Amino acid sequence: MKITILAVGKLKEKYWKQAIAEYEKRLGPYTKIDIIEVPDEKAPENMSDKEIEQVKEKEGQRILAKIKPQSTVITLEIQGKMLSSEGLAQELNQRMTQGQSDFVFVIGGSNGLHKDVLQRSNYALSFSKMTFPHQMMRVVLIEQVYRAFKIMRGEAYHK
């Protein structure tokens, strides 16, 4: 089994990098995990709707170029389905039982995900109706993936 977190933009702050590294280490016994960053598109502050769509399209092309045809794509979206930690564990476990073994979680840029990425998605996941910094979302996501594996194995952690 392989998990990839595919995110737009780079982690800059040391504390986010340290948190990600800690969960990568913790996930080691359970699964292979890769973090792939694609460059965010530089854009002015006050963009028109057309310019926002162009930025999302360019970032979307970069995202799609990193996804293999056989990958199960889980996009993080405000409009996605909200799950409990147990629900995420159940969703991943069910998909693994069906033979899916290459999961790609996609975190878009500050303007969201392009429609082509959303169409490629096999599952839309939401952590909240609120907006979070993308760097923080990476840490929350990798922690929840770790928690899901602990739950799937029946190990103590999630309570």
Swiss-Prot record:
Residues that, per the record, bind S-adenosyl-L-methionine: L76, G108, F127, S128, K129, M130, T131, F132
Gene3D superfamilies: 3.40.1280.10
Known EC number: 2.1.1.177
Record's catalysed reaction(s): pseudouridine(1915) in 23S rRNA + S-adenosyl-L-methionine = N(3)-methylpseudouridine(1915) in 23S rRNA + S-adenosyl-L-homocysteine + H(+)
Subcellular localization(s) per the UniProt record: Cytoplasm
InterPro entries named among the record's database cross-references: Alpha/beta_knot_MTases, RlmH-like, tRNA_m1G_MTases_N
Protein's UniProt keywords contain Cell membrane: no
Main location: cytoplasm
GO molecular function: rRNA (pseudouridine-N3-)-methyltransferase activity
CDD domains for this protein: RlmH-like (cd18081)
Key words of the record: Cytoplasm, Methyltransferase, rRNA processing, S-adenosyl-L-methionine, Transferase
UniProt enzyme class: transferase
Listed GO CC annotations: cytoplasm
HAMAP family for the chain: 23SrRNA_methyltr_H
Subunit organization: Homodimer.
Entry similarity comment: Belongs to the RNA methyltransferase RlmH family.
Function, in words: Specifically methylates the pseudouridine at position 1915 (m3Psi1915) in 23S rRNA. Specific for fully assembled 70S ribosomes.
Protein name: Ribosomal RNA large subunit methyltransferase H
The organism of origin for this protein: Staphylococcus aureus
Gene: rlmH
